[in-house]
Curated annotation (Swiss-Prot):
<comment type="similarity">
    <text>Belongs to the helicase family. PIF1 subfamily.</text>
</comment>
<dbReference type="GO" id="GO:0006281">
    <property type="term" value="P:DNA repair"/>
</dbReference>
<dbReference type="InterPro" id="IPR051055">
    <property type="entry name" value="PIF1_helicase"/>
</dbReference>
<comment type="function">
    <text>DNA-dependent ATPase and 5'-3' DNA helicase that efficiently unwinds G-quadruplex (G4) DNA structures. May be involved in resolving commom issues that arise during DNA replication, recombination, and repair.</text>
</comment>
<dbReference type="GO" id="GO:0003678">
    <property type="term" value="F:DNA helicase activity"/>
</dbReference>
<protein>
    <recommendedName>
        <fullName>ATP-dependent DNA helicase Pif1</fullName>
        <ecNumber>5.6.2.3</ecNumber>
    </recommendedName>
</protein>
<keyword id="KW-0547">Nucleotide-binding</keyword>
<keyword id="KW-0413">Isomerase</keyword>
<dbReference type="InterPro" id="IPR027417">
    <property type="entry name" value="P-loop_NTPase"/>
</dbReference>
<keyword id="KW-0234">DNA repair</keyword>
<keyword id="KW-0378">Hydrolase</keyword>
<dbReference type="Pfam" id="PF05970">
    <property type="entry name" value="PIF1"/>
</dbReference>
<dbReference type="InterPro" id="IPR003593">
    <property type="entry name" value="AAA+_ATPase"/>
</dbReference>
<comment type="subunit">
    <text>Monomer.</text>
</comment>
<dbReference type="InterPro" id="IPR010285">
    <property type="entry name" value="DNA_helicase_pif1-like_DEAD"/>
</dbReference>
<keyword id="KW-0233">DNA recombination</keyword>
<dbReference type="GO" id="GO:0016887">
    <property type="term" value="F:ATP hydrolysis activity"/>
</dbReference>
Length: 439
């Protein structure tokens, strides 16, 4: 084994979502960590408040998965920034866990309302800490209220009342979600400095090995339209080939849906409609339908292109793996992966939880979606081998970077067009990350 790496043996607990019972305990293969990853894992284990960051493909999610295997999720819950992410994580949202709701009436009204919630106060006293996933999408005001509520619940003036906080994400990707349209970056709020985060900056891209592509991604992440960026993007511009199987990334949902419908209609096979099976109260099911990336009906045909929506515990696929449907039965779909063998896919359970971690509603469905097109936003976290994208009319900071950084290799990049004005980064984000250069 390489003397510059550490080797850890991890054990995975397999549990049916919502059952509360561990179904089995089994060893998995030893995982060799790079010095950077091993150092990051040591800091995660240290008990300090940690900010785990790095560009796309740097292994943030991988490290958190390893760390979580050592923990009781009741003592250290993982909190998602959006409802859709919470459904895929099998967790709770940041806003629901801290009783923030939609923050109606502003910060003061939200704090007063939440501080009177006895269940919330009890919940914040019981946990050892929280892991906040995709921290870039949490507004600063929400983080500030959550910290104040933690202090009140735990009757302590320590940051977060002594509760541990691990923040994970990349501020150079998608910005915070707010109702005002303002970018309320949480690192600009005073609570960020008070939290005393120890920063881990993962610098090695685990997804891409092409040095030129890595340099281009770095430039785009920093909002730099350098000569090499111009040359690189221009080289990949081509007329749209409707028959090419690569995934299309659109900035808007409606365009992705229409493209998927059109490509499915072109296949001369019988359409198979698989209804999602819901359980829970009617009200909670409606909430799940709005938040979930799982459609009410999965419509497929033999020969259609599909994409996996979640990582497989047995490592047969990851979020973003593509393949072709070769067989469909009531209980199983056989998919021939683009890069590998055929796999049999069973249904998964996806759920929304209340603030206490109890299942409110869940849905059973195959963890698949049509792969002809998706949105840039939904592609975050996915790894693609082939994509088509138009970078001409983007408007959000980080959109171009998220799109380009989905790829393993530049060989799979097809650009319909691009515009320098679409390569955007917030100057405040650039200034924030300068302090970590050299970490």
């Amino acid at each position: 084994m390489n003397s510059e790496s550490k080797c850890y043996r991890f054990y995975i607990c397999f549990a049916r979502l919502g059952s509360g019972m561990i179904a089995g305990l089994m060893p998995v293969h030893e995982i060799e960590l790079s010095p950077e990853q091993a150092s990051a894992l040591d800091l995660l284990r240290s008990g300090e408040n940690v900010f785990l960051t790095g560009g796309a493909g740097s292994g943030k999610s991988f490290l958190i998965r390893q760390f979580m295997r050592e923990l009781d999720p009741k003592e250290m819950p993982i909190l998602a920034s959006t409802g859709a992410a919470a459904v895929l994580l099998g967790g709770r949202t940041f806003h629901s866990f801290f009783g923030l709701g939609i923050m109606e009436g502003g910060a003061d009204a939200t704090y007063e309302r939440a501080s009177k919630d006895k269940r919330l106060m009890s919940r914040l006293r019981k946990v050892e800490g929280v892991i906040i996933d995709e921290i870039s999408m949490i507004p600063g005001q929400a983080l500030m209220i959550a910290e104040a509520l933690s202090q009140r619940a735990r009757e302590s003036k320590l940051p977060w009342g002594g509760m541990r906080v691990i923040a994970v994400g990349d501020f150079a990707q998608l910005p915070p979600v707010t109702h005002t349209g303002q970018r309320d970056w949480c690192f600009l709020n005073g609570v960020w400095e008070v939290s005393g985060f120890q920063t881990v900056m993962l610098s090695h891209n685990q997804r891409v090995s092409d040095n030129l592509f890595l340099d281009v991604l770095s430039d785009v992440r920093h909002g730099k339209v350098t000569e090499r960026v111009r040359e690189f993007l221009n080289e990949h511009v081509q007329d749209h080939d409707e028959d090419d199987p690569g995934t299309r990334l659109f900035p808007r949902k409606i365009n992705a849906e229409k493209f998927n419908e059109r490509k499915l209609a072109e296949i001369d096979e019988t359409e198979v409609v698989i209804e999602s099976i819901y359980s829970g109260s009617e009200r909670h099911i409606e909430t799940l339908k709005k938040a979930s990336p799982i459609a009410e009906k999965l419509i497929l045909k033999i020969g259609c292109q599909v994409m996996f929506l979640q990582n497989d515990p047995q490592r047969r696929w990851v979020n973003g793996t593509r393949g072709t449907v070769v067989d469909i039965t009531a209980d199983q779909i056989t998919v021939r992966k683009d890069r590998g063998r055929e796999v049999q896919v069973s249904k998964s359970s996806f759920a929304i939880q209340d603030a206490e971690g109890n299942i409110m509603a869940q849905v059973e469905q195959f963890p698949l979606t049509l792969a002809y097109a998706t949105t840039i936003h939904k592609s975050q976290g996915a790894t693609l081998d082939d994509l088509w994208c138009d970078l001409s009319q983007l408007w959000e900071p980080g959109q171009a970077y998220v799109a380009l950084s989905r790829l393993r290799s530049a060989k799979g990049l097809h650009l319909i067009g691009w515009n320098p004005r679409s390569i955007i980064v917030d100057p405040k984000v650039l200034h924030f990350y300068k302090q970590f250069e050299g970490l």
